[in-house]
Amino acid sequence: MIMTLRWFGKNFDSVTLKQIRQIPGVKGVITTLYDSKVGDAWKEEDVKNIKKEVEDAGLKIYGIESVNILDDIKIGLPSRDKYIENYIKTLEVLGKEGINLVCYNFMPVFDWTRSDLAKVRPDGSTVLSYDQDIIDKIDPQKMFEQIDSNSNGFVLPGWEPERLSRLKELFEMYKGIDDEKLFENLKYFLTAIMPTCEKYNIKMAIHPDDPAWPVFGLPRIIVNKENILRMVNSVNSPCNGITLCAGSLGSNPKNDIPDIIRSLKGKIFFAHVRNLEHTAPGKFQEAAHLSSDGSMDMFAIMKAFYDIGFEGPFRPDHGRAIWDEVSMPGYGLYDRALGAVYLQGLWEAIEKMGK
């Protein structure tokens, strides 16, 4: 297995590369140019610099999360071709630097949605949580402001300030965009970029929608096994696949995560593994990675990855805020380090049992 940690860069992350290097078994990072403007092509110099910084710390960049996709592309505006061309230029820069994985999503407006960034767990830790009743009663603008004010001063991925100023405009732009239209626009995007991906062997790994159902009336198209299989089969390329995020798909208890993993053999390029606790229909709290702390069977999930021969990068996903750490919600050092070691322990046990 290749264990990694997500790292947002020295100017945006409370966790340092030195600290990541000291987590047992962690070989590298999944990172991004966090200050890049969505829609612009990345500069070769910037990619070289962050690659050198990571390698100087004794680590490796195993992938990018994310090269965000402008809403013009998702909506299918006439301007999309210009921004797809910029995206292709970015892929070329990454490919020339030997970076061969991009995790991305195709969620409208919000990359992910939570009702609380600091829900208190029985052990006193705090976690991200979702309550559909709260979401149903809150205005999107108000929710955005609330999330931003509770971010501990960090810019959250997918919640960039420039989106806040355009929120009402974006909702207007998505009127008339249903699941089918959004899927058509995803297929258009993938068809356009696949030749470049194949040239440089860049695996495009779409991230499931989070949570795995419609929010604020916006379409959601990557929420279950059927959606994912349709997506990977719609654009036939060895570079078109999935980031298997156990937590995002697991937000809907109807999704059988081990079954989904086995159904996608050969199409999973990257894995996010985390636990959550279902508290009621449409309500969940994130939890420690340990199976008994939540509703998900982490052993069964890791066993499914082992059974399909998965050799790509893993990362522990959102961690609890523990031991008085102040960090970007979900992305502190301590609980993710615990998660990384726990997942590797499961993998070692499964591997030895299989011999």
Curated annotation (Swiss-Prot):
One Pfam family of this chain: UxuA
Pathway entry: Carbohydrate metabolism; pentose and glucuronate interconversion
Entry EC no(s): 4.2.1.8
Domain of life of the native organism: Bacteria
Catalytic activity: D-mannonate = 2-dehydro-3-deoxy-D-gluconate + H2O
GO MF, one example: mannonate dehydratase activity
Keyword annotations from UniProtKB, A to Z: Iron, Lyase, Manganese
Co-factor requirement: Fe(2+); Mn(2+)
Signal peptide (UniProt feature, chain positions): none
Stated family: Belongs to the mannonate dehydratase family.
Function: Catalyzes the dehydration of D-mannonate.
UniProt name for this protein: Mannonate dehydratase
